[in-house]
Amino acid sequence: MSKKCQLTGKVANNGYAVSHSHKRTKKLQNVNLQYKKVWSTEQNKWIKMLISTKAIKTLTKAL
């Protein structure tokens, strides 16, 4: 399973976890990916896609 949004192409973000004493350790911020069935008008059927929650929110706003 790829950790990439099939609709927007979003991938994980590299960052730092900063402690109280300001020690920095590398941290990976993953994308919130969910499986969602999306209706395809071209193929005239449901397609199961792995998309980010932001993409789901955008799709529901468009409808």
From Swiss-Prot:
Signal sequence region: none
SUPFAM superfamilies in the record: L28p-like
Membrane-spanning parts: none
The encoding gene: rpl28
GO molecular function, one term: structural constituent of ribosome
GO cellular component: chloroplast; ribonucleoprotein complex; ribosome
GO BP field: translation
Family assignment from sequence similarity: Belongs to the bacterial ribosomal protein bL28 family.
Main location: plastid
Keyword Plastid: yes
Localization per Swiss-Prot or TrEMBL: Plastid, Chloroplast
PANTHER family per record: 39S RIBOSOMAL PROTEIN L28, MITOCHONDRIAL, LARGE RIBOSOMAL SUBUNIT PROTEIN BL28M
Pfam families: Ribosomal_L28
The protein, known as: Large ribosomal subunit protein bL28c
Sorted UniProt keywords: Chloroplast, Plastid, Ribonucleoprotein, Ribosomal protein
Superkingdom: Eukaryota
UniProt keyword Plastid, yes or no: yes
